[in-house]
């Protein structure tokens, strides 16, 4: 009885373990069109550089984000986490270009509307998600 339980537990653990295959496209082979599909209709593709910002405690833009070590800029981006982000234009001619050729750093999906959080007890706006975390 215990042997059967041990074998059943082992089989369940092996089948539940994540595989090395992501199921989706590799980030290095992803085109701008595929990245745009991953982002969705209400988001745009941004290329985020290394973290070059510094936290200024006297700035009005640092609220709770400043306490957590992230500066929320005027555009609503968490600059400390993703760095300085610039929008990658996706037009008809560039849809087939590889994402890696357009952005050698971190690519992210960001909301088109400015992310602003006001009037609540905890005001935290998270407008961007790294594209690498969307690939499964």
Swiss-Prot record:
Q: SMART domains in the record, alphabetically?
A: HYDRO
**UniProt signal peptide:** 1-16
**Gene knockout outcome:** Leads to complete ablation of slender rodlets on conidial coat. Significantly reduces conidial hydrophobicity, adhesion to insect cuticle, virulence via normal cuticle infection and dispersal potential. Does not affect radial growth and multiple stress responses. Impairs significantly conidial tolerance to a wet-heat stress at 45 degrees Celsius.
This protein's GO cellular component annotations are: extracellular region; fungal-type cell wall
- Which superkingdom is the protein from? Eukaryota
Spell out the subcellular localization from the entry: Secreted; Secreted, Cell wall; Spore coat; Vacuole
Give the Gene Ontology MF terms in alphabetical order. Answer: structural constituent of cell wall
- Describe its function: Aerial growth, conidiation, and dispersal of filamentous fungi in the environment rely upon a capability of their secreting small amphipathic proteins called hydrophobins (HPBs) with low sequence identity. Class I can self-assemble into an outermost layer of rodlet bundles on aerial cell surfaces, conferring cellular hydrophobicity that supports fungal growth, development and dispersal; whereas Class II form highly ordered films at water-air interfaces through intermolecular interactions but contribute nothing to the rodlet structure.
Which protein, by its recorded name, is this?
Answer: Class I hydrophobin A
* Organism name: Beauveria bassiana (strain ARSEF 2860)
Q: Which gene encodes it?
A: hyd1A
């Amino acid at each position: 009885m215990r042997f059967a339980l041990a074998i059943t537990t082992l089989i369940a653990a092996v089948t539940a373990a994540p595989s090395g295959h992501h199921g989706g496209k590799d980030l290095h082979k992803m085109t701008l069109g595929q990245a745009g599909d991953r982002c969705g209709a209400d988001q745009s593709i941004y290329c985020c550089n290394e973290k070059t910002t510094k936290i200024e405690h006297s700035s009005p833009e640092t609220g709770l984000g400043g306490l957590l070590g992230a500066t929320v800029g005027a555009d609503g981006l968490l600059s400390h986490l993703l760095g300085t982000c610039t929008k990658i234009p996706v037009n008809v001619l560039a849809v087939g270009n590889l994402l890696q050729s357009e952005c050698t750093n971190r690519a992210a999906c960001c909301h088109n509307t400015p992310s602003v959080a006001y009037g609540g007890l905890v005001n935290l706006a998270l407008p961007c998600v790294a594209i690498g975390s969307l690939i499964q």
